[in-house]
Amino acid sequence: MSDNKVEVDKRRTFAIISHPDAGKTTITEKVLLFGNALQKAGTVKGKKSGQHAKSDWMEMEKDRGISITTSVMQFPYGGALVNLLDTPGHEDFSEDTYRTLTAVDSCLMVIDSAKGVEDRTIKLMEVTRLRDTPIVTFMNKLDRDIRDPIELMDEVEDVLNIACAPITWPIGSGKEFKGVYHILRDEVVLYQSGMGHTIQERRVIEGIDNPELDKAIGSYAADLRDEMELVRGASNEFDHQAFLKGELTPVFFGTALGNFGVDHILDGIVEWAPKPLPRESDARMIMPDEEKFTGFVFKIQANMDPKHRDRVAFMRVCSGRYEQGMKMHHVRIGKDVNVSDALTFMAGDRERAEVAYPGDIIGLHNHGTIRIGDTFTQGEKFRFTGVPNFAPEMFRRIRLRDPLKQKQLLKGLVQLSEEGAVQVFRPLDSNDLIVGAVGVLQFEVVVGRLKSEYNVEAIYEGISVSTARWVYCKDERKLEEFRRKCSQNLALDGGDNLTYIAPTMVNLNLSMERYPDIEFAKTREH
């Protein structure tokens, strides 16, 4: 068996998706603790303690206690090498999150057991559906009062349209939380509070009918036996093939803050989640065990190091292997580049990567030549597909306090748009600059970064824009005519793509009726 195959088989690359405040950052911490990447979980954001979560590292994130940028962490667990892509959890950070989901092979969905399925979870699940990504589910916060577990699973099935197969089952909740029963292993793992910061041995009782169980948890043991009869009759059994197709999700219960149940999830991911999968390109399917190196960029991050105004392009390796100093072909610009200083990540701690395999994420230093969606190969000319831009949902006009810095403003905005922090539009008929985002917080981030990184003071003004669509037409003549007649609604985005800026949805619908040959697209392939 080749080295490459051994390494590929070891890899598991996944992201965590959840609604804000469902406990995603805490889970990330605890997962790293189990992977020995952290000695003591930095319980997230004790405001006074100065102990910040390892994966939240940009200044603004430290101030607010939210993860604004996707960071990447690699750690060994159970004979596998796990790559965890942390996704922005806050209300407003979704476009980056959407794109991160294109770089993983499976996802862990975290649900607050007191609340059930929430909006953001629904949106993110829609994105995972584009590629039928396998989903593992963790019902979190069992140390609080929760909704009925069967009701929670029914809601996941109804709202997210995915079958649930419970792997562990909770015994009590809130102050009466006693532990979980592991259905496949037929064992009860007992919960003790106050063990959230370190990994300690848990008491395990083998067998649901073991008299030891009655001694340990009293009448809860009989309740559990009755409940399991019901659960076995009413729920799905775990089916590995259905899981790999994205049709069924294994469900685990626990509390991330109490560091309980996290090892069960990791065991499940290592045992069941797919190793690095083949990827589609515009030429053919690229298999992970091919000899030649290929990869694509799914995110660009500015200033991971405040001392240097650098940018790092995050690349998912798809086939072959990266070796320090190798030559890569940058397909979009048709140039070969020597890469000797790619990085691996442990959230903000960068190390030079000597070698990387399919499923791994590496960082390339970028001085403005790399864009989101770029493909790198060892000479072959094709493009990986499926890394989209999403039409913004909110818009502002942006202008300078000091009009002499227009050039820096445009440069800053174009760079931030290439990175995916925001989208920028330049109307054909005016000198305005319009910024589009998927959520309000992105606007704040952009003004903050323009000031700290480009020394530009910018302010926003309201603008009557409802939505944007990328426009295409196979017939050049018809496109030119459309451009002439609708120029007051047209703009170029950061990559000079023609975009229709609609003041209202009614206006958009009328234009779509009036120009049936023009395609108005909600997403755009990079």
Swiss-Prot record:
GO terms for biological process: regulation of translational termination. GTP binds at residues 18-25, 86-90, 140-143. Keywords: Cytoplasm, GTP-binding, Nucleotide-binding, Protein biosynthesis. It comes from the Bacteria. Belongs to the TRAFAC class translation factor GTPase superfamily. Classic translation factor GTPase family. PrfC subfamily. The keyword Iron does not apply. The keyword DNA damage does not apply. This is Peptide chain release factor 3. GO terms for molecular function: GTP binding; GTPase activity; guanosine tetraphosphate binding; translation release factor activity, codon nonspecific; translation release factor activity, codon specific. One of its GO terms (cellular component) is cytosol. The gene is prfC. InterPro entries: EF-G-like_DII, EFG_III/V, G_TR_CS, P-loop_NTPase, PrfC, RF3_C, RF3_dom_3_sf, RF3_GTP-bd. Increases the formation of ribosomal termination complexes and stimulates activities of RF-1 and RF-2. It binds guanine nucleotides and has strong preference for UGA stop codons. It may interact directly with the ribosome. The stimulation of RF-1 and RF-2 is significantly reduced by GTP and GDP, but not by GMP. It is found in: Cytoplasm.
